[in-house]
């Protein structure tokens, strides 16, 4: 039996690899890109319309689905066009991870080197011994050990970079150490970061746009899709192998450390048994996007900038725009809602209106003293749970919400003033957010 399972697993891998070698790669520029008919994929027009209407309601500016390298669906909203530029926010982290791998492959740097080798001693406010423990690898995996309780999450001045724990002792989504990877690459290669991006990636995959401005990458939507297609092709663009180092490529898109299963080298990973999210040290059970394929990995940015890569479906999905709901870093509730619709485009499957969709959750008043009202957009069909955690990750309140209503009044008791994390677990997944107690 075990032998049969192993054979089936190897066959699935073989089929996935074969599909990815048959990818179409568009020529350079922003004009020519072959398309594939949604009808040929068995997608229902009614469900496509539902998806596109939902995206419009959620402040989307552009949306693309790439299937087998070809455009299956492309939509722009308002005055935004295929020639408009938009920011990637933290989705640009994943591009930096790729560029770091290229710099290592060229012999310019080693991610296991101390960051001080490239930035010099004193790039932090730590002792030389503490600072010396931080490797480029720790910057890629969000495990630098630096104190994230700062006024400005993006401040890279040494005075902002203080010791909290040894490098590798915890995971926390902290921007400043990541931003300094750009400086590491510039120091190691002797090349301006924009120039390095242009010569190593942008020109080679035919991007018509792309520029770093104050550590944030901007491009056209199709160029974001090109990067997703490069990743889907395992670092190969047509006949040009940009990344030969398969070990580094695989490390980028697999669990990188012991704390957050759902994080690789600046890439978010679906299909894991637990996850940690930006802004908290809590470990949540379950995958980050339950409605998406388990093998999906993603470049995710603030205000719902998304580049999803799905090897099993030979698919890349890109969304750019303003925040769909709350303004959150990287992962948001929008991910799961979007994939509830993308995953049900096929006419032969169950439509999103027939499946369990995550209701919209509101908590008010926020800030509050000791009473909260939680409201759902639709009545609960099954019992749910709300939990409240302090910023140390301690559970300070929990209650079962019985099905049948969409509004619940909660008395959370007397709690110290501060910011708390709430988690609402429904049968469709979970929603997280912040609430302030005065």
Residue spans of the language-model regions?
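Active-site helix/loop module of the DD-peptidase/beta-lactamase fold
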Residues: 106-144, 191-223
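C-terminal outer-membrane/trafficking sorting elements
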Residues: 6, 356-438
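Active-site SXXK
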Residues: 69, 86-112, 139, 181-185, ...
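Bacterial Sec-dependent N-terminal signal peptides
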Residues: 1-21, 352, 394, 410, ...
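Residue-level detector of functionally pivotal "anchor" positions at catalytic/ligand-binding pockets or at interdomain
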Residues: 20-35, 346-364, 377-379, 394
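Penicillin-binding protein/beta-lactamase superfamily catalytic region
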Residues: 165, 202-311, 324-329
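A short, well-structured edge-of-sheet supersecondary motif
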Residues: 51-80, 308, 314-318
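Catalytic-site signature segments of enzymes, centered on catalytic residues
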Residues: 82, 145-219
């Amino acid at each position: 039996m075990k032998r049969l399972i192993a054979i089936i697993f190897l066959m699935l891998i073989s089929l996935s690899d074969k599909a990815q070698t048959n990818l179409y790669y568009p020529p350079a520029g922003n004009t020519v890109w072959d398309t594939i008919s949604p009808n040929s994929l068995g997608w229902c027009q009614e469900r496509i319309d539902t998806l596109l209407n939902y995206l419009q309601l959620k402040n989307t500016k552009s949306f693309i689905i790439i299937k087998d390298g070809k455009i299956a669906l492309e939509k722009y909203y308002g005055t935004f066009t295929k020639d408009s530029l938009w920011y990637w926010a933290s989705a640009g982290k994943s591009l930096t991870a790729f560029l770091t791998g290229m710099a290592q492959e060229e012999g310019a740097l080693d991610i296991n080197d101390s960051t001080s080798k490239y930035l010099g001693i004193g790039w932090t406010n730590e002792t030389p011994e503490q600072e010396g423990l931080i490797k480029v690898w720790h910057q890629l995996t969000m495990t630098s050990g630096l104190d994230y309780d700062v006024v400005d999450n993006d401040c890279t001045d040494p005075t902002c970079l203080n010791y909290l724990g040894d490098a590798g002792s915890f995971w926390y989504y902290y921007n400043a150490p990541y931003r300094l990877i750009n400086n590491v690459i510039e120091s190691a290669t002797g090349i301006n970061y924009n120039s390095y991006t242009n010569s190593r990636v942008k020109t080679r995959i035919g991007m018509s746009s792309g520029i770093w401005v104050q550590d944030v990458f901007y491009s056209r939507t199709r160029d974001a899709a090109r990067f997703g297609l490069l990743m889907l092709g395992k670092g190969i663009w047509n006949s040009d192998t940009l990344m030969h180092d398969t070990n580094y490529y695989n490390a980028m898109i697999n669990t990188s450390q012991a704390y957050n299963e759902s994080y690789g080298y600046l890439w978010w990973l679906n299909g894991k048994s637990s996850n940690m999210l930006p802004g908290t040290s809590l470990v949540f059970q379950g995958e980050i996007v339950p409605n998406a394929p388990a093998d999906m990995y993603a470049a995710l940015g603030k205000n719902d900038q998304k580049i999803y890569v799905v090897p099993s479906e030979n698919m890349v999905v890109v969304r750019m725009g303003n925040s769909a709901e709350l303004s959150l870093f990287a992962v948001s509730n929008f991910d799961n809602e979007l994939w509830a619709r993308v995953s049900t485009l096929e006419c032969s499957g169950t439509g999103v209106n027939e499946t369990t969709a995550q209701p919209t959750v509101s908590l008010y008043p926020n800030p509050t003293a000791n009473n909260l009202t939680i409201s759902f957009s639709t009545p609960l069909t099954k019992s749910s749970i709300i939990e409240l955690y302090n910023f140390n990750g301690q559970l300070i309140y929990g209650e079962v919400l019985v099905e049948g209503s969409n509004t619940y009044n909660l008395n959370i008791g007397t709690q110290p003033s501060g910011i708390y994390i709430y988690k609402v677990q429904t049968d469709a997944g979970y929603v997280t957010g912040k609430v302030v107690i005065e």
